[in-house]
Amino acid sequence: MDASSSSAPDLADAYDIPWVEKYRPTRVADVGGNSDAVARLQDIARDGNMPNLILSGPPGTGKTTSILSLAHELLGPSYREAVLELNASDDRGLDVVRNKIKMFAQKKVTLQPGRHKIVILDEADSMTSGAQQALRRTMEIYSNTTRFALACNTSSKIIEPIQSRCAIVRFSRLSDQEILGRLMIVVAAEKVPYVPEGLEAIIFTADGDMRQALNNLQATVSGFRFVNQENVFKVCDQPHPLHVKNMVKNVLDGKFDEACSALKQLYDLGYSPTDIITTLFRVIKNYDMAEYLKLELLKETGFAHMRICDGVGSFLQLSGLLAKFALVRETAKAS
């Protein structure tokens, strides 16, 4: 599909609301990916008796959307008065747990038999240990009337007493096909002009994060009115994978000086070493090479990333990484 085969969107209407919100699923069944987790939540919606839940997984995988959809399905028109949602932008210290959450749990709301009020705590792993201890007690006292749903990136940061009171539902990063499926729905609805390589670039930059994919798509359409590879990488401000791939190819072909020049160009463009090494990791992961070679390159990339995160001479570390790559190549040739 080319630019001429689809009209540009009406920009006056297209950006009134972020596409992440505009196309957020309203039913649990419509949540993309993580079929096992979604199936468990659908069972809860059918049964009507929701346990306390911990939804754990990387950002942008559908945790918050799933629990909001579940709350809508369980409570219907009573949703507004029977749900308390607190996210990372809200103060969720000890006072909030003792006052706001406790007052909500004490509030009388008329619901269908077997239904409960729901407290949704987004990014619960950022709550202090003291607040979590207070929450544990509140969960215990009001278990007959109120259920709690905690969304977090890592469940290990939730204290054990809360974990033991909850059913844990784990979410994983979405596959490229799952992200592409949702992007195609949005592209068709918004009449976005695109080329397939542009959507591939969005999937690459999203790295399994649906929220990131939709934000990148909307930002590209907003800035350039057309989704192609070049525009996506300009908007996302990430090193172009083709440049990084050529750099790796030069090392593996024995053209070390050319690889160093390519690295210097990327560095001079203002990309952070973390951006460069993250793109490098993804490129190597998908690069067609001998398995032994790929394993060694990934190992060296991991060590270099660790040193860069410690703040050690970043450009020097990247140059040293290319030298390690060349050494691995020579060792592989000798054997």
UniProtKB/Swiss-Prot annotation:
<dbReference type="InterPro" id="IPR003593">
    <property type="entry name" value="AAA+_ATPase"/>
</dbReference>
<keyword id="KW-0539">Nucleus</keyword>
<dbReference type="InterPro" id="IPR027417">
    <property type="entry name" value="P-loop_NTPase"/>
</dbReference>
<dbReference type="GO" id="GO:0005634">
    <property type="term" value="C:nucleus"/>
</dbReference>
<dbReference type="GO" id="GO:0006261">
    <property type="term" value="P:DNA-templated DNA replication"/>
</dbReference>
<dbReference type="GO" id="GO:0005524">
    <property type="term" value="F:ATP binding"/>
</dbReference>
<dbReference type="Pfam" id="PF08542">
    <property type="entry name" value="Rep_fac_C"/>
</dbReference>
<dbReference type="GO" id="GO:0006281">
    <property type="term" value="P:DNA repair"/>
</dbReference>
<dbReference type="InterPro" id="IPR008921">
    <property type="entry name" value="DNA_pol3_clamp-load_cplx_C"/>
</dbReference>
<dbReference type="GO" id="GO:0016887">
    <property type="term" value="F:ATP hydrolysis activity"/>
</dbReference>
<comment type="function">
    <text>May be involved in DNA replication and thus regulate cell proliferation.</text>
</comment>
<dbReference type="Pfam" id="PF00004">
    <property type="entry name" value="AAA"/>
</dbReference>
<keyword id="KW-0067">ATP-binding</keyword>
<dbReference type="InterPro" id="IPR013748">
    <property type="entry name" value="Rep_factorC_C"/>
</dbReference>
<dbReference type="InterPro" id="IPR050238">
    <property type="entry name" value="DNA_Rep/Repair_Clamp_Loader"/>
</dbReference>
<keyword id="KW-0547">Nucleotide-binding</keyword>
<feature type="binding site">
    <location>
        <begin position="56"/>
        <end position="63"/>
    </location>
    <ligand>
        <name>ATP</name>
    </ligand>
</feature>
<protein>
    <recommendedName>
        <fullName>Replication factor C subunit 4</fullName>
    </recommendedName>
</protein>
<dbReference type="InterPro" id="IPR003959">
    <property type="entry name" value="ATPase_AAA_core"/>
</dbReference>
<keyword id="KW-0235">DNA replication</keyword>
<dbReference type="InterPro" id="IPR047854">
    <property type="entry name" value="RFC_lid"/>
</dbReference>
<dbReference type="GO" id="GO:0003677">
    <property type="term" value="F:DNA binding"/>
</dbReference>
<comment type="subunit">
    <text>Heterotetramer of subunits RFC2, RFC3, RFC4 and RFC5 that can form a complex with RFC1.</text>
</comment>
<dbReference type="GO" id="GO:0005663">
    <property type="term" value="C:DNA replication factor C complex"/>
</dbReference>
<comment type="similarity">
    <text>Belongs to the activator 1 small subunits family.</text>
</comment>
